[in-house]
Swiss-Prot record:
Signal peptide: none annotated. It is found in: Cytoplasm. Zn(2+) binds at C247, C252, H254, C260. Its cofactor is Zn(2+). Pfam families: RsgA_GTPase. The lineage of its organism: Bacteria, Bacillati, Mycoplasmatota, Mycoplasmoidales, Mycoplasmoidaceae. The gene is rsgA. HAMAP family: GTPase_RsgA. This is Small ribosomal subunit biogenesis GTPase RsgA. InterPro entries: G_CP_dom (IPR030378), NA-bd_OB-fold (IPR012340), P-loop_NTPase (IPR027417), Ribosome_biogen_GTPase_RsgA (IPR004881), RsgA_GTPase_dom (IPR010914). Binds 1 zinc ion per subunit. GO terms for molecular function: GTP binding; GTPase activity; metal ion binding; rRNA binding. Disulfide bonds: none annotated.
């Protein structure tokens, strides 16, 4: 039977059986416990489960199409980065760090959700609308979370997918979750009871049934902190991709190198200035070729 690992609690694995639409406890086959085995079961894995006697056994792990180490989760279909326009103010540098990280980790659908748009004044809304157009030109889907039509479009986008919500506290993630699936509160209580833990004691990653798919529930997405190399960062801005291959040097970091196609594209207004400026700020943070992203840092704000 095909299943998905939804939680690991004290070396106990809980899986969702696709066909039966139930959740059961399962034990990994002994081979997965050996240090020599490449794959170790983790939350998000699609697995094969067999009932042997009275025990469900995980006998196979299907190939992952992506995975994160911190938080530890595999096979993410969509990441929705939620940022507020006011209270707190929109921070494009923080947002671009999120975007770069998930692009670098092979997550194909990274979406942007803007909350509290209705609280912005007209002057700020004009700037935000220009910002939205710039992101859309770079093939990012942007949703204004206070607009009912955008919520409907987002519901359709996430249907039957494994979704992660990223973003700092206070930006409206909880409100959004209830808008996307009003039954989530009851289901969260059911899952907490199944896993025998309180709803306020989440210390590890788990998946909750959500919008005919799954929602990643983890403490690790609120304050992203990861390591990226300079070369990874240089390749993580998707608006650079069409131009970077024309750089003179294959390892060009697009800072001061001669014959850099990215700098030329910025001069020709093919890449927007503020995105490139944010890129320079990000990559110049890199000591010894490593970037430690801290999304709570004080960075550029759109006012």
């Amino acid at each position: 039977m095909r299943a998905k690992i939804i939680s690991v609690v004290a070396n106990n694995f809980y899986v969702h059986l696709y066909d039966l639409k139930i959740q059961i406890k399962a034990i990994p086959k002994g081979i997965f416990k050996h240090n020599s085995h490449e794959l170790k079961p983790m939350v998000g894995d699609d697995v094969e489960v067999e009932l042997i006697g009275n025990t469900y056994l995980i006998t196979k792990i299907y190939e992952r199409y992506n995975q994160l180490i911190r938080p530890k989760v595999a096979n993410i279909d969509i990441v929705l980065i939620v940022v507020s326009i006011v209270q707190p103010d929109l921070n494009t540098l923080s947002l671009n760090k999120y975007l770069a990280f998930y692009e670098a980790r092979n997550i194909k659908n990274v979406l942007i959700g803007l909350s509290k748009y209705d609280l912005a004044n007209n002057h700020l809304k004009q700037k935000i609308n220009k910002l939205i157009l710039d992101y859309k030109k770079n093939n990012y889907a942007v949703f204004i979370l206070t607009k009912e039509n955008d919520i409907l479009l987002l519901k359709e986008k996430i249907k039957s997918k494994t979704l992660c919500l990223a973003g700092n506290s206070g930006v409206g993630k909880s409100t959004l979750i209830n808008k996307l699936d009003p039954s989530i509160q009851q289901r969260t209580q059911e899952i907490s009871h199944f896993l025998n833990r309180g709803k306020h004691t989440t210390t590890s990653t788990k998946l909750i049934s959500f919008a005919n798919g799954f929602l990643v529930d983890t403490p690790g997405f609120g304050n992203l902190e990861v390591n990226l190399t300079k070369n990874e960062m240089a390749n993580a801005f998707n608006d650079f991709a069409n131009y970077a291959r024309f750089c003179k040097f294959s390892n060009c970091l697009h800072i001061e190198e001669p014959e850099c196609a990215i700098k030329k594209a910025v001069d020709e207004k093919l890449i927007v200035n503020w995105r490139y400026d944010d890129y320079l700020k990000i990559i110049k943070e890199l000591p010894n070729d490593v970037l430690k992203i801290k999304t709570r840092a004080q960075n550029r704000k759109c006012k």
